[in-house]
Amino acid sequence: MKASGTLREYKVVGRLLPSVKNPAPPLYRMRIFAPNHVVAKSRFWYFVSQLRKMKKASGEIVYCGLVFEKSPLKVKNFGIWLRYDSRSGTHNMYREYRDLTTSGAVTQCYRDMGARHRARAHAIQIMKVQVIAANKCRRPAIKQFHDSKIKFPLPHRVLRRQHKPRFTTKRPNTFF
């Protein structure tokens, strides 16, 4: 999978094709994070073939649809449980992110894993994504934003305008 652009959350439901022996096969549902519905269906078959004796040729997709965030204007803390294949083996990992949406947090996770661990998107498997209460957060990088009286420094910006005179009679004001 190529994690291009912002990933979207899909709900994919699939099953084995009905047969004489099994006329009503059980349905399997998955939350898949993918750039589009084609990749989402492909990832569903990849994961379901690892878990059950099912494959695309002997099964069907019953439903594949986007899942929308309930409250996309509220900042939330997300805990992501994942496993990834590195050059030395397979590792389990728990990570925390702050974002507005679940898909935004997962996209952030894919970017972070690529930057910190050189893990490609195809080598990462998201197992669970959950909204976490502020008191349950473990990572100090996330906990630092839980202060209600948080203050950010004003930037010391030096404006370099090309069409202004280079030498002038007054000093520039760089504090805003």
UniProtKB/Swiss-Prot annotation:
Subunit details: Component of the large ribosomal subunit.
Protein name, per record: Large ribosomal subunit protein eL20
Entry's family note: Belongs to the eukaryotic ribosomal protein eL20 family.
Location relative to the cell: Cytoplasm
Functional description taken from the UniProt entry: Component of the large ribosomal subunit. The ribosome is a large ribonucleoprotein complex responsible for the synthesis of proteins in the cell.
Gene Ontology CC entries for this record: cytosolic large ribosomal subunit
Predominant cellular place of this UniProt entry's protein: cytoplasm
Alphabetical list of InterPro entries matching this protein: Ribosomal_eL20, Ribosomal_eL20_dom, Ribosomal_eL20_eukaryotes
Domain of life assignment: Eukaryota
Example of a GO biological process term: cytoplasmic translation
Organism (species): Danio rerio
Swiss-Prot/TrEMBL keywords: Cytoplasm, Ribonucleoprotein, Ribosomal protein
An example Gene Ontology molecular-function term: structural constituent of ribosome
Keyword Cytoplasm: yes
